[in-house]
Each structure stands twice: as C-alpha cells, then as structure tokens.
C-alpha cells in the first residue's frame, strides 16, 4: 500500500492511499467502516436531456465521487472491494453508487476518528510494500542473479559471474560461496528464498547452501526455469510460487500462535478465550498477546460494541494485538472459539 496523502488533526481527517496488492484490498476492508466518506474515480452514467429521450445512448463517464459508506464487500476471487453508499460529493448528490476498489485504485478515506489498529494496518501495509518478503536467486553454471520481489515489481540486487573453471570443484565452491555471501547481506530475517534456474546447478547450490547456512537455507524452495536473469524471475512469478510463499508465511505465523493457544488451553495454562475471560485476564494485567479475528472486529464495530476499548487497554498494558484473517484456517479456528482469545503472561483463575 502506498500512502499518497495524510491530513489528520488528532485522530480526525483524511488518508489517501493506492492499493497495490490483494492484501491491501483485504486491509482496506477492515480500515473502511460504515459512515466513512470515501473518494475515488469511478464510472457513472451522464444523464443529459437528450440521453433521457434516447436512453440507449447513455454512456458512462469517469468522475470522482465521494460516497458515505453504508455497506462494503470484499470479493477475493474478483480481486475487488465494493463500497456502496450515498453520493455526498460530485455529480448526482443524494443518489446511491458503488465504488469498485481494485489493485491500482487511488482512494481517500475521511474519518471522524481513526482507530489505533486502522492506523497500524496502514503503517504495516506501507512498510510491507517497501521491503522484500521474497528474495529470488536465478542460477546456472558460473552465473547467478539475485532479485528482490516488491509489490511494484522485481529489483535486481546483484549479478555474480565466474567466467572459467566451472568443472573445478574449488572454483565452483568459490562461486557458490560468493552467492551465499551476497545472500547473507541481501536477505531480511523474515524473507523467504526461491532458488531457480535451468539444469542441475540449482540443486548443487542448495546442497552447498544447506551445509554452509542451514537456517537461511531452510526458508528456500526450488523452482525450474528455462533461463536466469529477469526472464527467469518472471517465470517464477507466472507460476505462482511467490504468491504461495507470501500467503503461507502469514498462515504459518498465525498457525504458530493458534498452536500455542490450543496447547495452553488443553493444559489449563496461560490462555483465555471468549470475551469475558479475556476481559478478566486483562483486569489482572495478564494479557501478553491478544488474538482477534478480523470478522469479530468488524462485527463488533457494526453492532456498536466497544471492542476498540479492549484493544487500546491491551496496548496500554504493553500487550500485543494480532488480527487474524478468517480467510485462512487459523482465523477460522479462532472465530469458532468466539473470535477473541489471549496468550497470557501468567495463569489467571476465572
């Protein structure tokens, strides 16, 4: 997500963003609420006097509208967030319209009060767009390219070449050593790695990688490509390997937290689930990590429940808040447990 304008007085005001990924659309589903004023460029029928005489001639024109949101739907498989509401700014004020927010859409969101988790979501999404979550190595005998996968495209980090001695073990290992050394400097701690290329060089390299950097190599997977360089990177993207990695990394983090929660619950240990038990634990200052399902957060706000007060109190007590996606299994499990739970600093009796 790219923030293009931020104009806040305290917690009131406007933030303008560009949605760059499907994840950004998912974030926006939980940032935008009923009652927000949202501006974006859209298409709407331009009704002139002649159009009304011959309605078959009515054409849609591009206009910038501001609507007061009264309903929103995230269509995951259509890659679209739909915002429905009454037009307050632009043409046909007082009529209803639906804004289709897609990847690449620019929009402005105006709120009377921005909540902590909404601002944090924007910050997290903005930071995620700047750092690579996946590093790719396209390698063949004597040649390797390292690239970063960003939301806006692929950035070539380095090219390593060994022009001769490909059959000499010492020189080949020296080439592999140089690639590994570049990766030590290039790979952020949370990033995954794709090793790609034609032939068997990539398999030989991954063995060397596992021997010299086992922790980093454990995050790597292998993909076949017909060539190296930018064309090889594009092959990896077309096959969907990067999308799978980025989705799986989130699922893995949320799965680990759910495993911790289930284990503590089964031991009658340092865990609480359900709103009542979580509030009780919070009163004792015991909440270390609050787990809340995105649907529970949205439903609570729509019903007027002060769920945000609970989130603020956890943060004020130096606790961490993790919002789970119910689009994935860990989030579904959490939702079935009441949508809210906590890992505790110490055991609390109910």
Curated annotation (Swiss-Prot):
Major place of localization?
A: cytoplasm
Q: Which HAMAP family match?
A: PelO
What is its quaternary makeup?
A: Monomer.
Q: Give a yes or no for keyword Hydrolase in this entry.
A: yes
What's the source species for this entry? Answer: Methanosarcina barkeri (strain Fusaro / DSM 804)
Into which EC class is this enzyme placed?
hydrolase
Named cofactor requirement(s):
a divalent metal cation
This protein's name: Protein pelota homolog
For this protein, what is any one GO molecular function term? Answer: metal ion binding
What's this chain's function? May function in recognizing stalled ribosomes, interact with stem-loop structures in stalled mRNA molecules, and effect endonucleolytic cleavage of the mRNA. May play a role in the release non-functional ribosomes and degradation of damaged mRNAs. Has endoribonuclease activity.
User: Where on the tree of life does the source sit, at the highest rank?
Assistant: Archaea
């Amino acid at each position: 997500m790219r923030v293009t304008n931020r104009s806040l007085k305290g917690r009131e005001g406007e933030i303008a963003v560009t949605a760059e990924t499907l994840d950004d659309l998912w974030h926006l589903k939980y940032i935008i609420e009923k009652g927000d004023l949202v501006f974006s460029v859209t298409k709407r029928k331009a009704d002139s006097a002649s159009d009304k005489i011959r309605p078959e001639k009515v054409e849609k024109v591009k206009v910038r509208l501001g609507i007061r949101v009264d309903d929103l739907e995230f269509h995951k498989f259509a890659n679209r967030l739909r915002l429905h509401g009454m037009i307050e700014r632009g043409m046909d004020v007082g009529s209803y319209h639906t804004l289709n927010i897609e990847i690449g859409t620019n929009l402005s969101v105006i709120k009377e009060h921005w909540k902590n988790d909404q601002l944090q979501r924007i910050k997290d999404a903005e930071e995620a767009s700047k750092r690579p979550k996946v590093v790719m190595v396209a390698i063949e005998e004597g040649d390797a390219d390292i690239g970063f996968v960003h939301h806006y495209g692929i950035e070539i980090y380095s090219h390593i070449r060994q022009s001769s001695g490909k059959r000499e073990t010492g020189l080949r290992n020296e080439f592999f050593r140089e690639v590994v050394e570049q990766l030590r400097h290039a790979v952020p701690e949370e990033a995954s790695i794709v090793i790609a290329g034609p032939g068997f060089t990539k398999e030989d390299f991954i063995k060397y990688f596992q021997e010299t950097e086992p922790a980093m190599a454990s995050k790597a997977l292998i993909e076949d490509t017909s060539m190296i360089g930018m064309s090889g990177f594009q092959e990896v993207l077309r096959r969907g390997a990067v999308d799978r990695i980025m989705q799986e990394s989130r699922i893995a983090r949320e799965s680990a937290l759910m495993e911790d929660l289930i284990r503590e619950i089964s031991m009658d240990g340092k865990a609480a689930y359900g709103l009542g038990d979580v509030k009780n634990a919070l009163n004792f200052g015991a909440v270390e990590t609050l787990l809340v399902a995105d649907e529970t957060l949205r439903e609570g706000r729509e019903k007027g429940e002060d769920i945000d007060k609970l989130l603020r109190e956890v943060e004020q007590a130096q606790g961490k808040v993790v919002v789970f996606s119910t689009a994935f299994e860990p989030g579904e499990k959490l939702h079935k447990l009441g949508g809210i739970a906590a890992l505790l600093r110490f055991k609390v009796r109910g």
